[in-house]
Amino acid sequence: MSPRASRAVQEAARRIVRDRDGHRCQMCGASLVDQPSSIHHRRRRGMGGSALLERASNLVRLCGTGTTGCHGFVESQRTLATVRGWLLGFLDDPETTPLQCFDGWHTLDDEGGRHPFAGEVPA
């Protein structure tokens, strides 16, 4: 098992995500200014303490908490969330697995890039 990411690595990745996603829920597009929001792990933290889980490509800002808003939707509608790229399996690579955002399908990289995905997406 890989070691846990240090606090500095976690904060750096979260800073990248906040800069990339701004004040907008990446699922519904709602403004997150003065609204509850959270940073969602596409590949769940419960899958081990790997430092890979704190990569910016694995993290995305959503409205709500794990039980409310879009974050709650992802946690309660796991099959649909998986089809749309919001939840990943243990072997899925967050950098190459697209997700359906409010403005189309995108891939995310670890440097803060958000790239339109032109490949085949699930129906």
Regions found by a protein language model. Name each.
Residues 43-59:
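Short linker/helix segments within small regulatory modules
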Residues 40-41, 71:
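Histidine-centered divalent metal-coordination motifs
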Residues 30-33, 56-83:
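Short Cys/His-centered divalent metal-binding micro-motifs
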Residues 1-13, 117-123:
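Arg/Lys-rich, low-complexity, intrinsically disordered N-terminal tails that contact nucleic acids
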Residues 6-10, 17, 52-55:
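Residue-level marker of regulatory loop/turn positions in helix-turn-helix DNA-binding domains and
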Residues 10-38, 61-66:
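Short cysteine-rich loop/turn motifs with clustered Cys
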Residues 86-123:
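Short flanking/linker segments adjacent to small metal-binding domains or redox-active Cys/His motifs
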